[in-house]
């Protein structure tokens, strides 16, 4: 199951909620609640692998001045919470190879710019962008040492 993209879904929910309330600030609380329910409902579908994409937003850390990248979602609460709801959070990275051609990778662990994670422990920091290969790698039983 694929939801592409939860950023767009959140924007539609927020627009609907703003039209329903007199004070647009209340719409953000309703947005966070509805998106949490929707994301968890899809995430927890029995017997299904669920993939959700999200726009990427460039942010500047006011304390350190560092440039950070994270999910682009309306409302601070939703953007801050979303990564906690998933076992796997990847960033699609595009870098140039030695010949200057673009190469795509999925980053699976955090660094100074991207907040990523891999709870499976089965992935390298950068993986080729094949979700089928990544799913197979995660499902592969761990090697056990003979005693």
Locations of regions flagged by a protein language model:
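P-loop NTPase motor domains
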Residues: 1-2, 8-13, 119, 130, ...
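Conserved GTP-binding G-domain of TRAFAC-class P-loop NTPases and closely related GTPase folds
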Residues: 58-147
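P-loop NTPase motor core
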Residues: 3-80
